[in-house]
């Protein structure tokens, strides 16, 4: 057999973005090559041993809805599961899991090795093959050339990466891995706009040296135990473990302050900007100087190791300060550090240089995903990787590209934010970033995206069957509740008060009763008639169906109102702008606005409206110019005042 060197799609990098990109492309039937500097680190969790959280869990569910691997791998590796914001509304509830690092890597690698159309090869990439304005392949560190019609680059923190511990630093992609210096230099040659960012990680602690008896235990949810994937189950979960909570104190803070003169962040050695929402412990005591204490979570790294991850003390301070600050906390007085914490600086490329498909604007066929685009977090990377893999595959199939809108998915919100606003610091997803979050819930990710995933070719038969069964069950139950009526004649007042909180004065459909804020699906199903017969139950047994039915009915008014709002803005939001248009010709626009529009070349009117400094008045002027300019898409538009609104 001849060794293959020609593929439809090449994916460079085997982290969370790269693995999802490669799997998505291969699921869609394209011959795909995944190049990684080390096959042993495919799917490695480089920082915290957890998946999900507010906003992040929503992204994982969306990746899962389209056939991705992160959620199901977490179900197979998760050693603690919790629903965050469980007492709040469904829009902001989020799943979070602690994962066994080894089991997670095994789950990801197993899927990669067993995925048809996917080849793995262990080699770092030093160069890209570019002809004119199109990428045609990649060159490895030993000069092996691979050719493809699309290349997805997911380099993580490896591009010219530099690790800092105190005032000492060295080149690395992460601890124990070499940096991608040649590839970084090559990308700079291609004139892609770039900058430097920074992230960090805490020291790891030997659990045998921790006194858990003086700490607060934090168990996972037990009733019910959450599941991440629509294809997952509680039976998949390995043994469950608790986390533990301790706190910093004044002594801790004094020790940190005493080391700031040797901090690479506070002495100007590090130039890259760090993540605002995952600050180092140095940043915390500086930014929140009035706070006496910070909560620290001791998270187990896995079932077969004593290593613990102290979430909340990411640091690049010198090792002697790291040791002292760890040992200043309750329960950690005799702690042994297994690995020092560090900060890492790396190159990223301005995501405003990308199309909404994550293809670069200047080089056809070259896609970027993950931290190279200025994001932070496994979940953000995985979602981008999946999208880039899908669009790389679609391009090689000569099919139309696909990107979800802001009202369709958190993935759509993230990509739109990145390509219109760019980043000044590592971008993290939150539910607050989404205007339509009531419609973008974890529980309906499959209802929003699985059908389109099936049409694209990245959702398999088994998952499609599960989805169809759920969708049909939800529709049947909604119809039953809307067509089943209860009257005062067959419902005793005492029973009505027990289930509904008060008697009923007329006939009601079960759907109307379930809309009441104090009535749950479970209690409604227990409703009995005067003769003891079931008036509502037994209902459906599947938790996912019950949850979907209850949310759809209880929030119907809000969801319908949001849908109408989306419809109102949809036309202008998705109105395609001519890519050859010269914005410098638009009279009335400020020079700054014209410059920004020329630089970013927005694909739609919605994207243009979200570019920093582009006002509603500027959008109205632009529309007037386009209507007068003979662009047929704009000729029949209503008055511009409606667009500005």
Curated annotation (Swiss-Prot):
> Where on this chain does NAD(+) bind?
274-288
Which SMART domains does the annotation name? Answer: GIDA_assoc_3
Query: Which parts of the sequence bind FAD?
Result: 13-18
Domain of life per record: Bacteria
Q: Which N-terminal residues, if any, form the signal peptide? A: none
**Which GO biological process annotations does it have?**
tRNA methylation; tRNA wobble uridine modification
Task: State if Flavoprotein is listed as a keyword.
Answer: yes
Where in or outside the cell is it found? Cytoplasm
Put simply, this protein is called tRNA uridine 5-carboxymethylaminomethyl modification enzyme MnmG
Q: Please report the organism this UniProt entry assigns to the protein.
A: Janthinobacterium sp. (strain Marseille) (Minibacterium massiliensis)
The uppermost taxa in this organism's lineage are: Bacteria, Pseudomonadati, Pseudomonadota, Betaproteobacteria, Burkholderiales
